[in-house]
Every structure is written in C-alpha cells, then in structure tokens.
From Swiss-Prot:
GO terms for biological process: queuosine biosynthetic process; tRNA wobble guanine modification. SUPFAM superfamilies: QueA-like (SSF111337). It comes from Shewanella denitrificans (strain OS217 / ATCC BAA-1090 / DSM 15013). This is S-adenosylmethionine:tRNA ribosyltransferase-isomerase. Belongs to the QueA family. Monomer. The gene is queA. Transfers and isomerizes the ribose moiety from AdoMet to the 7-aminomethyl group of 7-deazaguanine (preQ1-tRNA) to give epoxyqueuosine (oQ-tRNA).
Amino acid sequence: MRVADFSFDLPDELIARYPTAQRNASRLLTLDGPTGALADKQFTDLFEMINPGDLMVFNNTRVIPARLFGQKATGGKLEILVERMLDDKRILAHVRSSKSPKVDTLINLDGEHQMKMIARHDALFELELLSELTILEVLEQVGHMPLPPYIDRPDEDADKERYQTVYNKTPGAVAAPTAGLHFDDAMLSALKHKGVNIAFVTLHVGAGTFQPVRVDNVLEHKMHSEWADVPQDVVDLIAQTKAAGNRVIAVGTTSVRSLESAAKACGDKPLATFSGDTDIFIYPGYEFKVVDAMVTNFHLPESTLIMLISAFTGVDEVRYAYQHAIAQKYRFFSYGDAMFLTKKAQ
C-alpha cells in the first residue's frame, strides 16, 4: 500500500483560514459506508442523523497556547512549539532556530521569563522553565495559539476561542480536535434532550499530527505518540449502547484513536479503561472494534488521518467523496467543513 494512493490536488482557495461566523454554520458531507452514497447537507442537519440511544464520544482536551518566541543570549531568535508538558516546569518541544540550542543554553522568552535547554531527544528538545510560575501559567501569559502551518497567518485574539471546543476541559493539546469545533452549547443541549448520550475521552493532540508521512510504503510509517485517557464511565456507556443495538459515534479522529487504542490494549477481552501513550496507526485493513460512525473534518493529502477514514469507509469511497467535495467547493482542514461517515461492512 503506497502513501501516494492517498494523494489529491487541492486548490489553495479551498483551505479555510478562518472559521465560519457561527460554529455550526459549516457544511456537512455525508458518506454512507455500506452504500458509498454521498449527500450534501448543513452541519445542523447532523441532529436528524443521530438517534436516541446513540452514544457520541467527544475529546475534551484543551489546546494550550503552545507557540513561544524567544532569543538566546547571543541575540539569535528562535520559535518554540510545545509537543508535550512533562511536568510543571519541563516541556518537550520543537525548536526552530538558525542554530539548534546546545545543552545549558539559556532562552529568554517574551515577558522576561527564561528557559534552559537540558537535553535533546532526537528531533525534540527538553526545556526547563526557570521561574516560580508553572509552564501553563507562562504559556497563558505569553504563548500564542498554535495554528496549523496551512492556515498561513499569525494567530489572532479570536483564535483563542474559536480554535478551542466549547467543552474543552483538560489542558495539554497543541492542536485542536477539529471535528468538535462545529458544536455549540445549544446543539449539545438539543442532542441530550433528544436522548443522545454524551461522553468524553481525552487525547492530547501533538504537533506530530501535522508531520508529513516520509516513507513511500504505508506499512513503514512510525506513528507519533500521544497521551489518551478512556475512563470507566465511557467504557460502561459503550457496553450499554452496544447491548441496546445503538451506535457509538466518535466526534473526530482523536476520539476514534482513543477508543480503538483502548480496544487494542484489551485484545480479545471486553473493553476496559485506558490511560497512557498511544501510537495506534489505523490504515485500510484495520478492523474497527468500537466505533460505528464518526464526525470528522477534511484531511491533508497523504496524511495518516485520510488513511484512517479510508479504513473506515473504503479507499475508493473516500477518494470519490473528496473529489466531490473539491468540485462542490467545500472548505478544507481545521477551520473547514465536516463529514459524517458510517462504517463500511468489514
């Protein structure tokens, strides 16, 4: 299986660089897995597609202002993108600089805060904050929202709200779980009132989600690792939902990966809680254990995420759906439109 099999040409003007005026004002392309049928909808139409008794699983991670700007004592400027908070003082980060910082290099941040480079781990740098404040407090003071590279503009004040789900709770992500950006409080309340069950997992999306696949053979790709948590209440709700013959609907590929990671860890045993790092890589041929349907945005060409949805609804079906979306001028990527996918028979 070749990475090039998941390529497509996207006109630059279809990349959404700003969100819609209202969260739920996006368009929605539905793809029925069993038949391959497509339908053009509005995101608000999703309400009619979710049945009482269905379980919707959301990722409640909170995006941290993970981009920092600073300079070394020599005056050399650098940009830091947090990959993961190790504790209250230490981070793993990507560092962009004309020269990579060496161990013990001091970095002066905006706002008079200082960090020290204490170790290097392959492409990532371990940095320690030299302050009485915590990393999270400093990020909230001087950090910038880590907009994806393809948005290609500086972050603005509005991004602090719009590049964040309304139900965010646990800080740690450096990219938004973007399928969730379409939901507002009113829609969530309406779904609950309809009898739809709502549950939350956590997966702290890392910057690796934007890293290109650098091999030709899909099977040779090594996934980045991210921290995920699937608590007991979610496990119980999934069991109840399945027993009643209803659907588990994941909102976003991060929710999919969280649930399927829990299932993978259990092997042939019943689903149980999961908390820890996951590097699950889902590509065509994978058999889904938990998820019956999903809400997702449109993904980058040759990305692991387009491979995931192709595993869910079929390679040819996804290719045709994306061709249709481009022809109909859907908006792509993080601030773009959404899809509702049901699983192809396995």
